[in-house]
């Protein structure tokens, strides 16, 4: 009887853990979609760029959620800034930087 109870407890603990991870991933998808849509709308880019930026921002949110180190978060922010700069023309990157609220949100 004790073994059955222990198995049930482990099963429910595993189920709750899995549910929490799925919920966190859904939140990351929502944040990445919002950032990519806002950047694409501001810079008047196409669907391919939106997909590319979604993947970039999802990577950013996923990596930031895995760490609590401020130093690591700064490294991630620098990576995102460099990838944005490499992906965009100089004019479009400057336009994004001028919109400081959006720029700070997408790199931090």
Tell where the protein language model's regions lie, with residue ranges.
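Charge-rich (acidic/polar
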Residues: 21-108
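Bacterial Sec-dependent N-terminal signal peptides
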Residues: 1-25
């Amino acid at each position: 009887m004790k073994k059955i109870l222990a198995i049930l407890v482990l099963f429910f603990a595993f189920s709750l853990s899995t549910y929490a991870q799925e919920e966190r991933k859904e939140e990351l998808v929502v944040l990445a979609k919002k950032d990519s849509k806002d950047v694409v709308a501001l810079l008047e880019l196409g669907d391919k760029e939106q997909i590319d930026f979604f993947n970039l921002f999802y990577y950013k949110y996923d990596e930031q959620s895995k760490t609590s180190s401020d130093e690591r978060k700064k490294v991630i922010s620098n990576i995102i800034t460099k990838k944005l700069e490499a992906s965009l023309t100089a004019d479009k990157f400057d336009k994004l930087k001028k919109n400081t609220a959006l720029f700070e949100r997408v790199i931090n």
